């Protein structure tokens, strides 16, 4: 094996190990997240409004917080999926659920879906403040 091949192999292994160890680190979602929420429902039609999400506590992949919307504030609890990118949260007094993605360290998407008589779909692009 040539010297250049060995150098390439060492660099490749270093990059692989570095990327693997970073992807195993559970992201921290604590903080206040603010952004525009775009929703659609039969009752309210197309709407865009300001959404505020506060993740108050996180322990490993589990977290809890509150979010504000037109009808008030709700408490929720959620989980970060093993891919360290996707998360889901639910509220006790809600018929739908929220699924999101970590887009950047301080930017997430959070999409809500609810079926049935109050069917609603919407996504928010949120930035941590």
What are the residue ranges of the model-derived segments?
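Hydrophobic helical h-region of N-terminal Sec-dependent signal peptides
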Residues: 10-15
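Boundary at the C-terminal end of the N-terminal hydrophobic targeting segment
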Residues: 21-25
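N-terminal, post-signal-peptide region of Sec/Tat-exported proteins
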Residues: 47-74
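Beta-sheet ligand-binding and adhesion/scaffold domains
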Residues: 27-52, 76-129
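Bacterial N-terminal signal peptides that target proteins for export
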Residues: 1-9
């Amino acid at each position: 094996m040539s010297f250049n091949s060995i150098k390439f192999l060492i660099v490749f292994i270093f990059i692989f190990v570095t990327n693997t160890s970073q992807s195993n680190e559970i992201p921290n979602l604590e903080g206040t997240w603010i952004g525009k929420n775009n929703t659609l429902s039969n009752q309210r039609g197309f709407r865009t409004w300001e959404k505020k999400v506060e993740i108050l506590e996180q322990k490993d992949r589990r977290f809890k917080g509150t979010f504000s919307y037109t009808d008030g504030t709700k408490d929720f609890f959620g989980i970060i999926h093993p891919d360290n990118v996707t998360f889901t949260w639910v509220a006790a007094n809600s018929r739908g659920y929220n699924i999101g993605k970590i887009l950047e360290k301080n930017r997430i998407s959070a999409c809500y879906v609810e079926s049935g008589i109050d069917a609603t779909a919407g996504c928010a692009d949120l930035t941590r403040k």
